[in-house]
Amino acid sequence: EIRENVPYKVLQHERAEADDIIGVIAEYTQQFGRHDDVLILSGDHDFKQLLKYSNVRQFSPMQKKFVECKDPAGYLIEHIIKGDKGDEVPNILSRDDVFVSDERQVVMTAKRFEACLTERTVDQERNYQRNETLVDLSKCPQDIKDDIIDSFETVIPAPRGKLMNYLVKKRCKQLIDSIGEF
């Protein structure tokens, strides 16, 4: 429905989540001097890593403010080490199946975190690689990246003229009042 009525490119890929698609597009805008402006409308902290690109901004609709991150690379490393319970990515001290088996993660204290920045056991390094694959949006497999970029370049957005009728039909008064911002 959105794809047919809103004048924006709408992408989906059967083997990629939305955050992967956004990560691929943000990275793609760095190529060939494009640097198209990218605005991510989401409060999801996973996107902080993309703020390393000067043309990428993130706005949190829930907080009604732009998300800032002074050190996106450091944030990414911290996210890899500490994991992300919301996305069921365990910290690097914990086993792969910790959430599936309903066990508690090994507690990641500040001291353990600092130690993991410089030294890791073989298991911790394996878990670091596991988490990097799951968390780092630049690690999307190349064939999926290629598909996403191809879709991005070929998809044709709906004509602008369809938007007003769609918003009226859906009774989106606030959006109708702001239609010039589309």
Regions found by a protein language model. Give the residues of each.
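Extended two-metal-dependent nuclease catalytic cores across DNA- and RNA-processing enzymes
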Residues: E1-D177
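Short, amphipathic C-terminal "tail helix"
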Residues: G180-F182
